[in-house]
């Protein structure tokens, strides 16, 4: 029995609260069970130097956790004077995932920064960040079109992510912290709304996993992502 009584293929309750803050062009509070992340999308005119003159835009991301997002307080990375390796890995993942959702040529010379700040962590913070940031990005792009700065919306479709893993020999979807910490295999999967894979991060923490188990985990992830995408689309219609 899973901690919340979920079935093996069931994601936690997902809530996406749009327009959560007033200044950013897109803002979403995303909740995957007890994991809560504030995602904002900020638009700036211009692109990084390596893209100047190429007529395309750029999407980048930053990720962080509030000091008491976890069971015990973690010092702010700003106080330490540098970002940790985990933080850099996650924010690069978020940026790669969301660039797959957008036609950068159609975006033109705009940069959109996605800031994902974890308020409360209970497993799956990077996958929640991607899923919430995609909705914030959609709102920001809609504003560019509504304001006449873009003629065509460059959004190609939704992108979402979910964690999957093997816990006590059973393949599970959307691991919460107690499951994640006990997992023999832990995997994060990012997909487009039509089920194409953007990224798979998978590690055998204990016993190596088989090819058949990998396919089972990917199938679980696809089902979970389909559910998350349906929630994203419903949120954008409200």
From Swiss-Prot:
Read off the InterPro entries from this record. ExoRNase_PH_dom1, ExoRNase_PH_dom2, ExoRNase_PH_dom2_sf, PNPase/RNase_PH_dom_sf, Ribosomal_Su5_D2-typ_SF, RNase_PH, RNase_PH_bac-type, RNase_PH_CS
Q: Which major enzyme category is it?
A: transferase
Please indicate if the UniProt record lists Transferase as a keyword.
yes
PROSITE patterns from the UniProt entry: RIBONUCLEASE_PH (PS01277)
Q: Does the keyword tRNA-binding apply?
A: yes
UniProt binding sites for phosphate: 86, 124-126
- What Pfam families does the entry give? RNase_PH, RNase_PH_C
- Reaction(s) catalyzed by this protein? tRNA(n+1) + phosphate = tRNA(n) + a ribonucleoside 5'-diphosphate
Keywords assigned by UniProt? Nucleotidyltransferase, RNA-binding, rRNA processing, Transferase, tRNA processing, tRNA-binding
**Domain of life according to the entry:** Bacteria
Look up the record and give one Gene Ontology term from the biological process aspect.
tRNA processing
Enzyme Commission number(s) of this protein? 2.7.7.56
Describe its assembly: Homohexameric ring arranged as a trimer of dimers.
Which family is this sequence assigned to?
A: Belongs to the RNase PH family.
Per the entry, what this protein does is: Phosphorolytic 3'-5' exoribonuclease that plays an important role in tRNA 3'-end maturation. Removes nucleotide residues following the 3'-CCA terminus of tRNAs; can also add nucleotides to the ends of RNA molecules by using nucleoside diphosphates as substrates, but this may not be physiologically important. Probably plays a role in initiation of 16S rRNA degradation (leading to ribosome degradation) during starvation.
Protein name as it appears in the record: Ribonuclease PH
Task: Identify the species of origin.
Answer: Citrobacter koseri (strain ATCC BAA-895 / CDC 4225-83 / SGSC4696)
Instruction: Provide the gene name from the record.
Output: rph
């Amino acid at each position: 029995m899973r901690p919340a009584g979920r079935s093996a293929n069931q994601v936690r309750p997902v809530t996406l609260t749009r327009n959560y803050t007033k200044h950013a062009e897109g803002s979403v509070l995303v909740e995957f069970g007890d994991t809560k992340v504030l995602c904002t999308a900020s638009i700036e005119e211009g692109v990084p130097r390596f893209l100047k003159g190429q007529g395309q835009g750029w999407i980048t991301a930053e990720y962080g956790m509030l000091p008491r997002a976890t069971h015990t307080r973690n010092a702010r990375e700003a106080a330490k004077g540098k970002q940790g390796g985990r933080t850099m890995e996650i924010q690069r993942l978020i940026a790669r995932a969301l660039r797959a959702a957008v036609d950068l040529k159609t975006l033109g010379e705009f940069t959109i920064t996605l800031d994902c700040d974890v308020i409360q962590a209970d497993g799956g913070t990077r996958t929640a960040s991607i899923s919430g940031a995609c909705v914030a990005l959609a709102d920001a792009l809609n504003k560019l079109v509504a304001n006449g700065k873009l003629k065509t919306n460059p959004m190609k479709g939704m992108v979402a992510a979910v964690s999957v893993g093997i816990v006590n020999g059973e393949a599970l979807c959307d691991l919460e912290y107690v499951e994640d910490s006990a997992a023999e295999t832990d995997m994060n999967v990012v997909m487009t709304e039509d089920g194409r894979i953007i990224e798979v991060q998978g590690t055998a923490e204990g016993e190596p996993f088989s090819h058949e188990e990998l396919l089972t985990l990917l199938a679980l992830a696809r089902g979970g992502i389909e559910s998350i995408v349906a929630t994203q689309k419903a949120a954008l219609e409200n």
